[in-house]
Amino acid sequence: MKKFILLAILMVFTLNVVAQDDLTEKATKITNEITKVLSLNKEEKTKVYEIQLKRFQEVVSIREKYKDDAETRKPELKKVYKRLFGKLKKALGKAKMQQWADYKREIGRE
């Protein structure tokens, strides 16, 4: 019985670590893309990474909290994305955010 409980605890811990690694990987991937497109310096890249990681963590939290309530989940996720834009705009400036928006629009056409 003790082994079973220990195994269950280890599985939960492992799943959390894997999920965190996945979020870190997503944040790194999008940060690298933004850095390449906008030619960010090291400080800007660090800020973008932190903003993106927090965004992904918030999204996971909201999806877990409202998994059975799509009507509430949708507006909560929209709030996260609006805050994301504001934080990125504050960190990078209006011109770079416009450049990023233009890039996203362009790749959307392809």
Language model features with spans:
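Charge-rich (acidic/polar
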Residues: 19-110
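Bacterial Sec-dependent N-terminal signal peptides
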Residues: 1-24
